[in-house]
Amino acid sequence: MPRVHNIKKSLTPHISCVTNESDNLLDFLPDRLRAKLLPFQKDGIIFALKRNGRCMVADEMGLGKTIQAIGITYFYKEEWPLLIVVPSSLRYPWTEEIEKWIPELSPEEINVIQNKTDVRRMSTSKVTVLGYGLLTADAKTLIDALNNQNFKVVIVDESHYMKSRNATRSRILLPIVQKARRAILLTGTPALGRPEELFMQIEALFPQKFGRWTDYAKRYCNAHIRYFGKRPQWDCRGASNLNELHQLLSDIMIRRLKTEVLTQLPPKVRQRIPFDLPSAAAKELNTSFEEWEKIMRTPNSGAMETVMGLITRMFKQTAIAKAGAVKDYIKMMLQNDSLKFLVFAHHLSMLQACTEAVIENKTRYIRIDGSVSSSERIHLVNQFQKDPDTRVAILSIQAAGQGLTFTAASHVVFAELYWDPGHIKQAEDRAHRIGQCSSVNIHYLIANGTLDTLMWGMLNRKAQVTGSTLNGRKEKIQAEEGDKEKWDFLQFAEAWTPNDSSEELRKEALFTHFEKEKQHDIRSFFVPQPKKRQLMTSCDESKRFREENTVVSSDPTKTAARDIIDYESDVEPETKRLKLAASEDHCSPSEETPSQSKQIRTPLVESVQEAKAQLTTPAFPVEGWQCSLCTYINNSELPYCEMCETPQGSAVMQIDSLNHIQDKNEKDDSQKDTSKKVQTISDCEKQALAQSEPGQLADSKEETPKIEKEDGLTSQPGNEQWKSSDTLPVYDTLMFCASRNTDRIHIYTKDGKQMSCNFIPLDIKLDLWEDLPASFQLKQYRSLILRFVREWSSLTAMKQRIIRKSGQLFCSPILALEEITKQQTKQNCTKRYITKEDVAVASMDKVKNVGGHVRLITKESRPRDPFTKKLLEDGACVPFLNPYTVQADLTVKPSTSKGYLQAVDNEGNPLCLRCQQPTCQTKQACKANSWDSRFCSLKCQEEFWIRSNNSYLRAKVFETEHGVCQLCNVNAQELFLRLRDAPKSQRKNLLYATWTSKLPLEQLNEMIRNPGEGHFWQVDHIKPVYGGGGQCSLDNLQTLCTVCHKERTARQAKERSQVRRQSLASKHGSDITRFLVKK
């Protein structure tokens, strides 16, 4: 192989970041980014720059490759646009890092590709973030756009995703990376187990540098002919000449280990825990081993497919056989209340067994497997990192073993092994990375007499190969063997059986009518029952329960929430919110929906109007409170008025809180005094008034220390020194823009000029100002930012999402929301969803008005009518129909069509199904698949699916509200997950003392038999469909738990019934109540 032998190794120049020369080389970086870099990270950036921006950064996991790549590409920002290719679950963390370290980029300049047709903003964005999952053979529109864009700078994160020469994503990415002028490949495991996995990455950076594939395979992969049965096969899975390969790689790859450059990081301690399995648990596995030995004794006795199928079956049987012992081990670890740890597994059966162990121990946990969406994974990671009550993370080795940070954990348990050391080390370093403050203990559970012992030996052999190739020395997974006597209890573990849905449930596992009659809602013990009391909603009861418990609690900042974990306790709350959520005011309007706010504002404002008259009333004893509606003095323990049954929390005000409140009717004459007088109102009243009259509060320019203190956003005394600064001009007003993809808020001047800084509102609430320059410690700026954070926090998550997606610049988020709402088209539709028939009618009407024709598009782009079709340039056949005759066909068979009827204008441009505007130019339409040209933009696509597809609608609402009821704040999704993952025999106990006890018997038993999300929470229309709220956007939707949804539906049904009766009565006579109305 002459090309390989003639390679001249370029010695890596010795670079020390202590010298002034290296510091001068990094002067181009933003000050904050340069100050954050560690010395070895500066070395990595300079290494790449000296190779003209084409290299591989292969530092060990957890050493900060992301920030190095950002620094490298920033040097070449004049050559952007920049393409960043990452695993799909890391799109948003990468976007967060880009916005954090390059604040000069505006939100509009960063484009996160959402689907295979989302290419409209690619040509106008400076940074494009793309997930590997979209690089498939059918993504023709996306592939064409990537090739046409000609990205000059490319980052490929976790570049070992390109290890296979035959994978579609490798073939798509290879020409894009080769064509780019600068290309940075990032991976902590360039080769997961074999040298063959390096070839595609090297070929992407330097084509033909190591020769052709056959030359490389023969030289470094020990390629040879091998027979599987009678079939010869070219085997490239070996390794040879590894020292030479290591020397050649050092010219294009920089790799540092944590033991070399991060000596202050606490150590990683591995421990191997072998144990014996009970004979009953390993019965099936022993049978498979006998079959395996029979095949191995007979040469050429089985085909490759048979052998691999047997190994896969043994792998799964090993998981089931050791699941009982793994459960006992997890329970043993949970006995230490101070431990937070990760559990990694591969098979769903093992993940299920681990989850059951945590549920049986009544511990809060998170679980990430392949079914969890990318956005939800980030939410779960934040929960584990920040919530001290979430002690266990149950993770899939493949789904959560790369790119995520779990430094809050001090222990890692491997319930199963995997086939290569790369995945194992990646999983280990989720906890052992920069930011870890304690040593990480890693436990490998090895079941003797199973596939584990064989896999452990295989992992060490592969580790020697990868260590020699990447690090220049032989390595193995160093793990001390644990004390056998200490783990003897594992061999006595009970055999575990999968939670099979087809298993027949015993009668004891289901609710019966007798038990249902005995059930009591736990909240009934805290609420006195008068003789005549109307039925109250679950929202009112739960909210009152939280408020009462908040008063009694020693920590007034914590919300007493309902707990679904300790379900056997008679006095436990029903759900436990995240710590972050608990830090907010317990009566914050951000948790209220528009409909709820509307119900609460009216009596509250009325009570303010009556306050003036009550000021002259003398103070009452402490044990009583006065109703503001009927003035009756009630016992302090009653949560509602004994006379008029008005709830104490909504329309009643304590006498001692009614100081200096003016009549609402005088507000118009003295608007300047309103903001000062509102300060004396209680928190709930102040926030409700802020929602009812946002304009006044937004226009108020006086921000007194008292309001700041009430919101928990006080200025530090030491900050008074920042009264003047020459580094930044002082503006009396700031503009803001919310990022579309992260929680960050970008700051602009009042003229709309970007100030190259951004922040996270939650950080400001926690008094963390490190993301902002020191100049923003000025008192004027602090006041403006604090005021923004207060207003922003008062909005619900759904309202914040509306502002983010708008991309607008604004001063006040409340006023911005009002402006966006005004601009939206007001529609009054009593139909729930858009149907294909609605689309067909709209398309035909468009064609009749402006000309053109209609066509039937399907996902397969197959012709539906052989008589009316047109052959496009790329050979795809799409039927073109006559708009005057197709309507009759649709009325005969309205739901048999698998596609949509789309209008095409006279120029041949297909029109958007949502807005009837051209989706693309004619030349592009010929190249694109007809199915990809349904919509003109991602916005129209989302709006269309939200209005026509229930599953898509639920998914989008879930992304924002995470399955938390917006009326009673119950985390219904968490209860669903616990019930789904629990053994069927224990599901009844889980449901027994929760908010679901109000549901009918059959519904409860269905939850036990076959739990689904729809049994626990629903997406409800705030403005009901019958009232004109159908086919709405997300701002008219909210999450409701099943109980609240049922009660709200019943209330709405009663209202509709009354309206119908009144309408019917008005046809035959006049309503007598009209004579009683005062004119």
UniProtKB/Swiss-Prot annotation:
Transmembrane segments: none annotated. Disulfide bonds: none annotated. The modification (Microbial infection) S-methylcysteine is found at C630. The keyword Nuclease applies. One of its GO terms (biological process) is DNA repair. Residues 46-208 form the Helicase ATP-binding domain. It is found in: Nucleus; Chromosome. Changing W625A: Abolishes interaction with 'Lys-63'-linked polyubiquitin. ATP binds at D59, E60, M61, G62, L63, G64, K65, T66. A zinc finger (RanBP2-type) spans 621-650. Residues 1011-1051 form the HNH domain. Residues 590-600, 713-725 have a biased composition (Polar residues). The modification Phosphoserine is found at S569. Residues 46-481 are annotated as: DNA annealing helicase activity. (Microbial infection) Methylation at Cys-630 by enteropathogenic E.coli protein NleE or S.flexneri protein OspZ: methylation disrupts ability to bind 'Lys-63'-linked ubiquitin. GO terms for molecular function: ATP binding; ATP-dependent DNA/DNA annealing activity; DNA endonuclease activity; helicase activity; K63-linked polyubiquitin modification-dependent protein binding; zinc ion binding. Residues 325-481 form the Helicase C-terminal domain. A motif (DEAH box) lies at residues 157-160. Interacts (via PIP-box and RanBP2-type zinc finger) with PCNA (when PCNA is polyubiquitinated via 'Lys-63'-linked polyubiquitin). The PIP-box mediates the interaction with PCNA, while the RanBP2-type zinc finger mediates binding to 'Lys-63'-linked polyubiquitin. This is DNA annealing helicase and endonuclease ZRANB3.
